[in-house]
Amino acid sequence: MTELRHDRPQPRSPRQDRPEARSQPKTQAEAGRFTRRTVLKATGAFGLAAVAQPLVGKRWSFIRDLGPAAATPLEHIVIDCQENRSFDHYYGFAPFADGFGPPAGWDQPDGNGGTVAPYRFMDLATPDVGHSWDAVQAEWNGGAMDGFFTTDGIWALGYYTGEELPFYYSLFDEFTLCGNYFCSLLGPTWPNRFYLAAGTSGGITTNGVWGYGVFDYPIILDLLEAKGISWKVYNIGWDSVPYGNTDNVFVFWKRWAKDRRTHGNRGDYLNDLRRGRLPQVAFIVPSYARGWDEHPPADVSVGMGIQEDLVTALRESSVWERSAYIITYDEHGGYFDHVPPPHIDAFGLGIRVPTWVISPFAKPSHIEGTVYDHVSTLKLLEHVFDLPTLASVNHLFDVSTPTGPNYEAANGASAGPPAPPRDELAVLGDMTECFTF
């Protein structure tokens, strides 16, 4: 593995079914007092060549050779995808985020010649902010990362600390935080969750698609099924309505929309742990309606509390010593982040999101600098369970998959030509870098 290191200034201590947020207040008077800073000016265009530039966190790591799958002690992998939080919004000012949070003086132009600095959220429930395809393009601004305030207002610049997120911050003592995990696409929920299932969004860039069984191309469940790897999707907080979980991405695929394993619930998860029957691969889908997925304006302590319960149940089970639990977020939700994402194709990568790797084999008190996106979780499953890549089985991508207008997403359209899965791209790590084995 070859690493390119980049020393940066130290940080300061301290859908269709869910409409996008309206414009938020943009004045300091509306949200309290803020410190004025000097704007950090972006230099040059941020294009495909930026993949080779050391712009990410404290270090940028490349995987040169995918190589054959190797034996690992992991027998169970749990993947939980929460909603709408950025890395800097949750951990940018954490004392352990040295070199991965905003550098001293980082701020945002206010659109009137001044600047506005990030500030601490004192409320656990705050308004939703813009995270549509168009809004995120403006926030990203070609890699300048200077459009959060002018696009979404003062609410986009709030951050939390360990006082508001005690369970999450406590994880650092024992486990690994990913410092360069990006969502897959510069856009909202559904296309990012498609990457988590399929390694591609099929060209879709908006939440303007919905329906059970509308897709029929291969996803990770097909690979697991073909290899005889047990799996289940646990819908946490959606116990009463069959097929009614609006955050369960797997119901979009014909083969799995009504499969009973796609519709497990919280009770199933707890019972499976008590009986030592946790499947080899488990996906956790917390309820959006109850705010358990942390999607604004939900109280962040509620979703965090659910995560603490789920993680604790795993740690107290007989399978813990052979397990890993990953907590990630589908996209950044419009909240600020200072790191320009690698621009690897017309769709992304997207903005950085917080991601924990919780396992007896996770590197303790460690921030991993390898570049990841949601496809990296698929690469981990492929590595641990010796699966083929989705790119290898999906080379004849179904171009009839509904994608809206067939324009280039890179040129600002709401959709683009279907793109192949990313799980053979060497620029994306497979998350084994987070473990001690």
Where are these regions (language model features)?
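N-terminal pro-sequences and low-complexity stem/linker regions of secreted or lumenal proteins
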Residues: 2-8, 12-18, 22-437
